[in-house]
Amino acid sequence: MISTEEIESFLHGNDPEEFIVAIEFDYASNSIYKIKEIPGKGKEIRKDTFIPFAWVGDLRNLNFYGNSKEAQKAAMTKYGIMIEKLETHGNERLEKGLTFMVKSLKGYRELIQFFRDGNLDPWGEKGKDKIMILPPVEQYLISKEKRLFKGFENYDEVTRLVFDLETTSLEPKDGRIFMIGIKTNKGYHRVIECIDEDQEKGAIIEFFNVINELKPSIIGGYNSANFDWHWIFERCRLLGIDPKKICKSLHPQHSFTRKDGMLKLANEVETYVQTSIWGYNVIDIIHSVRRAQAINSSIKSAGLKYITKFIN
């Protein structure tokens, strides 16, 4: 039985390092970057490393490396693989589960390739119940026992920026942005207005300039994943703006990415497009509201006006 003290220790992390607000992983160099917001000093980026790992079950019936021990040993040498048998303490359920930890001293991609060379895709049909490989950032936090936002008295100490667009239509192809509102929890408040497309170009560029100047740890909006960010990047395309030139991240070689995401709510799944900017936490506040709705039937709507009244 796990004690309350052990649970608390895990939740808060045993590593004492404070003020980490974001973690980024570089696949090319197998490097971890810790982004810290030091009170009174601002942003600081520090590089770190970790040993990637996978939890693995019994693979003997899956023809792994053709059941050849010699082939597997050669691959282990090639990819710097170490295998450790986990303690199960005679628990039958654990004995039938993921009882091995497989580590690669050469990197995260090498760990994945070790399994693929053995004709076993960790996320394929054969491997999905036998191999669990967490994303590298989660692995780093677990293995180094670090936690985000540790050391802050409360979240007001973390710089947060929220923004909202006003547009002339529902779709970017049919209208334009005529106002961008920006506010932080540190007293910054600005409204950027634009009356034509030339001013709209300048407004979008200025929006990213503000982010680069203030360097908030959290960038939030309401329904921003599928609306505000969609509008910004689509209007960039229509206006001939290269967003990679104006969207400056905290790393000179990384900018932003946009990829499909899923919000799981009990038996429902909602899709959205996640915007990620290196070094920042980009969030859509409506996702938190939708999760709260899933467990609190008194929240009747996710509309912004309703939620504002509900929490006040």
Where are the language model's segments positioned?
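The two-metal-ion catalytic cores of nucleic-acid processing enzymes
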Residues: 1-312
